[in-house]
Amino acid sequence: MAKKIAAQFRLLLPAGKATPAPPVGPALGQRGVNIMEFIKRFNAATASMGDVLVPVDVTVFADKSFTFEVRTPPASFLLKKAAKVEKGSGEPNKVTVGKVTRAQVEEIAKQKMKDLNTEDLEAAVRIIEGTARSMGIQVVD
């Protein structure tokens, strides 16, 4: 029989560098999860990812055990890194903060494919282009 799920939540953490400080400690502690066990397992699973922020879906069961699934970094994070900008535009339709090439967008789309709701690369590229547009990052050929 399957375990009873007590809680499900998502955290955005630096790969390989999770600590008991917020947001990890409070999110896990209030649900009775062993914080240090989570940190050790998460850091081991993401150590090879480098310096990126990764979303992690945590499922806590009624017996206080847990599982987690590491997802791909957010498209906005990857776009900011590719465009070499600190943050997106406050007025995306008026002010552009950076540029990315179509090849960079395709690379990001390939990396994000498993988390996007499409199997088609061209559709994935359009999704990433839309994210870039909403951040004030221009896509050039």
Swiss-Prot record:
CDD domains: Ribosomal_L11. InterPro entries: Ribosomal_uL11, Ribosomal_uL11_bac-typ, Ribosomal_uL11_C, Ribosomal_uL11_C_sf, Ribosomal_uL11_CS, Ribosomal_uL11_N, Ribosomal_uL11_N_sf. This is Large ribosomal subunit protein uL11. Pfam families: Ribosomal_L11 (PF00298), Ribosomal_L11_N (PF03946). GO terms for biological process: translation. Belongs to the universal ribosomal protein uL11 family. One or more lysine residues are methylated. SUPFAM superfamilies: Ribosomal L11/L12e N-terminal domain, Ribosomal protein L11, C-terminal domain.
